[in-house]
A protein has these predicted regions:
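C-terminal alpha-helical interaction module
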Residues: 1-135
Length: 135
């Protein structure tokens, strides 16, 4: 998961050649497709219990639509286009104490303002409006 997903978004975002970007995006979305299918039969990645693998995946998924989709050009599909991964992310977000650790405004500000080689104007987009609640 680290190479394909966690680091996959960075491999796409920092790619300096089309073939490197294409390879990273293809691998990333192949992994997301696989994870979407895997979550059809289990609550968490490794079954019924939360594991470190879930924590690692959540940190990438919670940033996906707000940052990686546009800033890193990981834009074949949004997280919300994956019903199981979207529900999984919202379920993780609803765990006690997790929501208070996620500040999307700060996350977006950090990514869009600190990576001048990707975003020379340092403009932080207003959207997307994301609701991680389990309504």
């Amino acid at each position: 998961m680290y190479r394909s997903v966690n680091n996959g978004v960075y491999r796409a975002g920092f790619a300096t050649a089309q073939d490197k970007y294409d390879a990273a995006v293809t691998e990333l979305f192949g992994a997301l497709d696989w994870l979407e299918k895997r979550l059809a039969t289990r609550r968490w990645l490794c079954g019924t219990r939360l594991t470190e693998a879930d924590v690692r995946l959540f940190t990438t998924l919670v940033r996906f639509d707000a940052v990686y989709y546009s800033h890193f050009k990981c834009n074949l599909r949004r997280l919300v286009d994956y019903p199981r991964l979207w529900r999984y992310t919202r379920r993780f977000y609803a765990l006690p104490g997790v929501a208070r650790t996620v500040d999307l405004a700060e996350i977006k500000s950090h990514y869009y303002r600190s990576m001048k080689h990707i975003n020379p104007t340092q403009i932080v987009p207003k959207g997307p409006a994301l609701d991680f609640s389990l309504r």
